[in-house]
Amino acid sequence: MKQIPLILAMSLAFAAAAKGESAPDMQAAVNFDSAMLWGGANGADLSRFNYSNALRPGNYIVDIYANNYPLIRQQVRFVAAQTSGQGLKTAPAVACFTYGQLEAMQVRLRALDPALVADLKSSGRCEVLGKLFPDSRESFDFGENRLEVSIPQAYTINRFRRDISPDEWDSGITAFRLGYQYNYADYIGGLRAGRRLDLNLYSGFNFKGWYLRNSSTLGWGQGRFTRRSQRTSLQTDIPSWRARLVFGDVFSSGEYFAPYSMRGMLVGSDTAMLPYSERLYRPTIRGVARTRANVKVYQAGVLVFQDAVPPGPFAIDDYSPASYGGDLRVVVTEANGAVQTFTVPYASAVRLILPGQTQWSFSAGRYRNYRNDGQDRPWVTQLTGRHGVADGVNLYGGLLIAQAYQAGLAGLSWNTPWGAMAADATLSRSQLSTTGNANGSSLRFSYSKTLSGTNTAIRLATLRYSSSGFWNFADAVNAGPVETNGRNGRFGLYSLLGRERPRGDFSVTLSQPLGGYGSLYVSALRRTYWGSSRVDQQTQLGYSTQVGRVGVNLDVSRTENRRSTEHQVMLNLSIPLYGATSSGVVTGSLARTGSAPVQQSVNYSGMSGERDQYTYGLGVQRAGTSAQYALNGSWSGTYGEVSGQLTHGRSYSQYQINGSGGLVAHAGGVTFGQYQAGTIGLIQAEAAAGAKVVNTRNAAVDRSGYGLVSLTPYSLNEVELSPQDLPLDVQLESTVEQVIPRAGAVVALRFPTRHDVAAMLVAEPGSEGALVFGTEVRDGAGKVVGVAGQGASALVRGVSASGTLEVTRADGSICRATYDLKSAGQAVHGLPRIALACAPQGGGERGARAAGQAVAQPSAISISGKDHEPDIR
């Protein structure tokens, strides 16, 4: 009970440190009176917790954030506020930034005095924010080791997300990587009796920014073994072009011409490489302010931008939309209170890029048909491009030239008050073996609009008409050879294979939110063909809502093709269930297709485990007199995932096992982990076995000190390790690392660790007053090795096998403990116990030899990422 007020005081201190946002020149707003503490903590020095930033002066590795967005992670010098010219008598330490750090934080250095900027750059000295930027503020979060800075927008370059330069991209290390997925199935009875094993392999080798990749499949079944290499490629980046270069098996995007595969080369711009501010189209907001006004921009009721503008015309293009589509409502409030409101149209389904931006792609090689490797492979070249000619207006086009085939495309997309639209035309010329040349055209129109009043979203994804002489490249090649096997440069007739070519396409989707009553959507598709009376049509109507905790979905569809017309009605209900150690959901459905019996099903699926690593489920499905029962479960661990399923019906049973995993071979050995198909982070944390990766399902550090984690390319990735499961003698000097990887790279994430000797310093009865809360413990050299917590004890790290520890009491006297860990007793968690015995205060200094009594482990204050010793250089 004596420790309760002490815990409360610590909580208040940390709450002030985490929540306060005092400027460096702000006086202490609160005072913690040590007289309110009970027991030996009475009289402890708590003055430094009177401030939101309770750090002592020194160098600390911290994560710097601006407006809750991560900027950089660097070692920052903290100086006493009174030495920074603030004139405080008692004050916290404040951050002091160098020229390089200010530049990395993307502040507007041109707004400062040029002489001051030149001095910072040449001298290498640092300066506090309060001297550089008026009204700037800072606060430090002990628990997160996070320095939050607030700088007025006038002094910042990017108001929302920090743009990333190609110079910051990390190409990664030399490594071999392998991802695998397997499936084993045993069918008993029914039409598919037998066993089958399939294995998918995704392998690669990375070397100095070049990435070799191969995807292959292996299969065993019905007494046969099959192996197939699906794709092999070698790729790298061209940073100055913001483009990627690929050799080998490549695929066309399908954005301009119908997609196809080829073996050759492809080079083209990649939007993921662009700065954040250029990746997403957004219309420029233009207006005129009569006075110094406040501008607010709303999208779907969400505030996406707010800033003050001077009198005169203004143009705003550095905001982040809440969604890709939906008109923007602009509210301009003048200094005299007058308000003007206007709307800027913004729609999304039609692709648009920013004014002045150009995106392009070029490919050349031989056509590849995975279904017929023996087919003749014509050479093909494709060039496409898109350019933003004005705000909301794009021109795009392309050329495709191949043996016996040529095509050209030109189009325009634009944003209007009535919605976003795009229109293009494609002309083709095909040399067919029987009928000679076939010339044709294909017209396409797209439209999208979100109605602001009702929030109705309209997507006319495709309205296309193709003439009888129009062929796309893949259709012409796949028509098959006729007599000459295509060696005369002509293609066979498509109709000879009994296949029709598309004539017209129409598709539309509407969605309508109904507030608290759910949402409604309608979609329709119609397709006609040349050379046939075939018509494919599909209509779907859906409604979803929430009734209490029950989710309700109703779907009605009609599908019509040449063979049949089918109607289907389906009702789904889902009920979430929550328990102390697990969670799950019960789903039930009723479905009726045509005149078939009503199909009923009830399923339960759940998750359990500390990190939801276990999933399980069971279900029953009934239609008429037949029933099917299913049972499944899965496990996700550090080294992969495994799942199994058992299905049993009236005349058949099926057993199925699926799994996946991956590995990376590098200079430090071979590290196993979960399946990774993209960019990989290789965690290196020596002696930190068991440390888990925060915000991942089950990634962790293995016994060799390595781990694997998935990363997002060309973006700032923050990977955090949890020290919760580490032994007390191992300390992570850094729990968070940041990296900006290239696509496909294996990037090293080095977490420095300290494997120090740790011990427990415990005050003997009668000496508790020497080891009160917050008291620093130093070794014989004067280095801080620990801070006292509760229970008149302190966890000390980095101590030698024998020596002296000392603490300074409130009256200035020093109490020492001489120890030898070889003869010390064992405390909780196997740590050696060092006893501290002191004379009453005022009685001078007194040393104490080590004793072997065990004590309970106390709590202690620690600062993540840096030793407690102030390091002012």
Curated annotation (Swiss-Prot):
Keywords per UniProt: Cell outer membrane, Disulfide bond, Fimbrium biogenesis, Membrane, Signal, Transmembrane, Transmembrane beta strand, Transport
| SS bond list | C815-C838
Q: Which Gene3D superfamilies match?
A: 2.60.40.2070, 2.60.40.3110, 3.10.20.410, Outer membrane usher protein FimD, plug domain
Gene Ontology CC: one annotated term: cell outer membrane
Q: Its Gene Ontology biological processes?
A: pilus assembly
Q: Spell out the InterPro entries in the cross-references.
A: Fimb_usher, Fimbrial_membr_usher_CS, FimD_plug_dom, PapC-like_C, PapC-like_C_sf, PapC_N, PapC_N_sf
Q: Cellular location of this protein?
A: Cell outer membrane
Instruction: Family membership, please give it.
Output: Belongs to the fimbrial export usher family.
Q: What does this protein do?
A: Probable porin-like protein necessary for the assembly of a pilin-type protein.
- The name of this protein is Outer membrane usher protein FimC
Question: Whose protein is this, by species?
Answer: Bordetella pertussis (strain Tohama I / ATCC BAA-589 / NCTC 13251)
Underlying gene: fimC
